[in-house]
């Protein structure tokens, strides 16, 4: 593994793995416990329209993606309040709308733009730039600081919104801000993980940790550790087997989840 780090692109990829393992499983834990695990898929699909606008208009896809995702995050919370008993309706509406808009925008662009969109669809952790790695560490710092400062309020909000409301917490504002932070994180992860697989890195490590952890904090720590080890293993395998890194990482997480689920079932 150390020999791989002699390459500059592998050094950047390894740093990106460290950054993503610090924040994506933390957000994933909240998403799962809030029964919003599909939100990561929804916002990643919506982000494609932001990428499309950026490529067609000739501006930074990252900037346009963040702008679109922030709007979608607010709208998603509105839909969640409208369809309280059917929250998946809001995610379905936004997901399909995001894909439709991206296809329409790209159809009006050049063929080279379509090729660039494919890079954002599947991502490539080994081709990300130093600026993109830095942006991942910035969002990691933001997520960790916010988690440290607002862990108790988010804990109450996650498990019982009614109690959070009675305690005087700004439930709607907190939910919107959480959606927005998650959206920005997804937008910054897309160049490395790809829009189609970004939810894997966010949700699967947290899903595995929930099978092993004994309390809320231990689940978060386990999720980050599992996320880091799984991504490093996927990076290592993809280099030697010559497979896409994001796909290799996904297979590893799914395999670990299935193995742990089977072991726990037989133990019981």
Sequence positions of predicted segments:
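Membrane-interfacial amphipathic/re-entrant helices at transmembrane-helix boundaries
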Residues: 1-22
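Transmembrane helix-bundle core of multi-pass membrane transporters
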Residues: 10-12, 91-150
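Hydrophobic alpha-helical transmembrane segments
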Residues: 14-19, 62-67, 90-93, 133-138, ...
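Short loop segments and helix-boundary regions at transmembrane helix junctions
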Residues: 29-112, 209-221, 240-241, 265-266
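Small-residue-rich segments of transmembrane alpha-helices in multi-pass membrane proteins
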Residues: 46-56, 94-105, 123, 127, ...
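Membrane-helix/interface signature in polytopic inner-membrane proteins
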Residues: 145-178
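Transmembrane alpha-helical segments in multi-pass inner-membrane proteins
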Residues: 192, 198-247
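Cytosolic-side transmembrane-helix boundaries in multi-pass membrane proteins
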Residues: 246-268
């Amino acid at each position: 593994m150390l020999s791989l780090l002699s390459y500059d692109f592998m050094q950047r990829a390894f740093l990106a793995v460290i950054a993503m393992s610090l924040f994506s499983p933390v957000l994933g834990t909240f998403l799962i416990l809030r029964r919003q695990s599909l939100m990561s898929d929804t916002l990643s699909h919506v982000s494609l329209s932001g990428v499309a606008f950026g490529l067609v208009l000739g501006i930074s896809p990252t900037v346009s993606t963040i702008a679109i995702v922030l709007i979608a995050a607010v709208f998603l919370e509105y839909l969640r309040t409208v369809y309280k008993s059917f929250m998946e309706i809001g995610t379905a509406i936004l997901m399909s709308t995001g894909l439709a808009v991206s296809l329409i925008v790209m159809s009006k662009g050049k063929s080279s733009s379509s090729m660039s969109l494919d890079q954002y669809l599947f991502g490539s952790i080994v081709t990300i730039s130093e600026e993109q790695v830095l942006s991942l560490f910035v969002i990691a710092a933001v997520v960790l600081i916010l988690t440290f400062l607002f862990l108790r309020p988010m804990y109450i909000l996650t498990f019982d919104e009614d109690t959070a409301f009675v305690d005087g917490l700004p439930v709607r504002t907190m939910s919107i801000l959480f959606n927005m932070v998650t959206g920005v994180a997804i937008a910054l992860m897309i160049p490395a993980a790809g829009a189609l697989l970004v939810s894997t890195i966010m949700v699967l490590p947290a899903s595995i940790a929930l099978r092993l952890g004994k309390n809320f904090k231990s689940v978060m720590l386990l999720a980050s550790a599992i996320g880091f080890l799984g991504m490093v293993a996927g990076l290592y395998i993809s280099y030697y087997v010559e497979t896409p890194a994001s796909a290799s990482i996904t297979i590893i997480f799914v395999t670990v989840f299935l193995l742990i689920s089977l072991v726990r079932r037989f133990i019981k």
